[in-house]
Amino acid sequence: MTDNNNGEIVEDKDNEKLKGEDNINNHISNHNNTEETSFEDPELEEMKKRFREMEEEAKKLTELQNNLESNITGNNGVGIGGNIGGGGGLMNTDQEEIDSRSVYVGNVDYKSTHDQILAYFQSCGTVNRITILSDKTTGHPKGCCYVEFVNKESIINAMALNDSFFNERQLKITPKRTNLPYYMRQGVLPPGRGGFRGGRGRGGIRGGIRGGRGRGNFYQPY
């Protein structure tokens, strides 16, 4: 359309004005969307990252628990056949029966090797497994180990080596005791079950609970 007074094209100007306004609105809308996206995405990514970290941590804890349940130490247990101490290395017998023919050896020199310990205890009887305890964080030896014999009779001979010197350190040897749940180590049982409170004399769990009045004391060398 043409203006008769000045000869300008009014319709074209109106169309250009509308197009300009649309472009401005689109620019503002795109800008707002960009701001929203840039504001939301980092937060969403951070949440996803934390969730993945939590999943990894839960997986590691599950693996650690499974290892502890399948093997007493989870590391450095070596059988005479050369098997490293994992769940498959243990014989398919009751854990308490295995412990009944094993001894705990404390104050062991940190540099002592499996072969040295084996040679030291071979005179007591046939050794089935030696488990050197290590720190789960550093992997360094704790200065103690378990020696498992084939026969229970070997325990008597091994106990005779208590206070003997091995690699210039005086060994402390005691019969190995089966690991007890936490609440049993504290001398109490969950509600509804009998506790370890007793009168005088020695308690009834393999001589491990000494009486007295009130709460019994549960001795564990390891």
UniProtKB/Swiss-Prot annotation:
InterPro entries, per database record: Nucleotide-bd_a/b_plait_sf, RBD_domain_sf, RRM_dom
Cellular location(s): Nucleus
A single BP term in Gene Ontology: mRNA 3'-end processing
Entry keyword set: mRNA processing, Nucleus, RNA-binding
Gene Ontology molecular functions: poly(A) binding; RNA binding
Protein role: Involved in the 3'-end formation of mRNA precursors (pre-mRNA) by the addition of a poly(A) tail of 200-250 nt to the upstream cleavage product.
Protein name in UniProt: Polyadenylate-binding protein 2
Origin species: Dictyostelium discoideum (Social amoeba)
